[in-house]
Curated annotation (Swiss-Prot):
This is SAR-endolysin. Signal-arrest-release (SAR) endolysin with lysozyme activity that degrades host peptidoglycans and participates with the pinholin and spanin proteins in the sequential events which lead to programmed host cell lysis releasing the mature viral particles. Once the pinholin has permeabilized the host cell membrane, the SAR-endolysin is released into the periplasm where it breaks down the peptidoglycan layer. The active site is at E21, D30. PANTHER family: LYSOZYME RRRD-RELATED (PTHR38107:SF3), PTHR38107. It comes from Pseudomonas phage phiKMV.
Amino acid sequence: MNKPLRGAALAAALAGLVALEGSETTAYRDIAGVPTICSGTTAGVKMGDKATPEQCYQMTIKDFQRFERIVLDAIKVPLNVNEQTALTFFCYNVGPVCTTSTAFKRFNQGRATEGCQALAMWNKVTINGQKVVSKGLVNRRNAEIKQCLEPSSQYSSLLW
């Protein structure tokens, strides 16, 4: 039903993702202490790793497409481009567990507005075994919600 973003839509989504994530060519620990590089890549990353800007770009595309596939497989109703992009950003940030979220449940119930708003629930990180609200995650979720609620006459299933 829904299809992967391509062309200008993909380029815009990647630019938005880099704006949310930033891009670091040297591995660092994220707020939860996970070794991370480039624009949020964590798979196989260890402290001391380095990447070129081109390698970061390629990692970001690969990661975005992996999480977009998770969204497309889990959401059974048509998504417009903004909804699809926001849900992919969300999954990129929280990982495959995104499919268990209230947001995904609401979308699959045909309640897109409530699904977008439910992204706000995912605003905490675990620090020393405690869930703590993160200002950075609050800001990120607000950006994702804004993207998600932005009207679009194009549905991702009709882009190509």
